């Protein structure tokens, strides 16, 4: 599978949002993270910082 870990970066702190995310959608309100089972986490006021597909890691940051 091609899932990635999604983290929220705040300053020097890197917090895991979802381990095996299959989809990340960035909206005006924030980010929606979905895994392959359909479980969703809504990260209000989050924006994409980096998507590293080699490391299977997606970094979000507060807007």
Where are these regions (language model features)?
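Compact, glycine-rich, soluble single-domain proteins
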Residues: 2-63
């Amino acid at each position: 599978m091609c899932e990635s870990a999604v983290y929220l970066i705040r300053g020097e702190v890197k917090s895991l949002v979802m381990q095996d995310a299959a989809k990340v959608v960035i909206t005006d309100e924030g980010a929606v993270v979905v895994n392959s089972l359909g479980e969703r986490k809504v990260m209000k006021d989050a924006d994409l910082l980096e998507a590293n597909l080699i490391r299977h890691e997606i970094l979000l940051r507060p807007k």
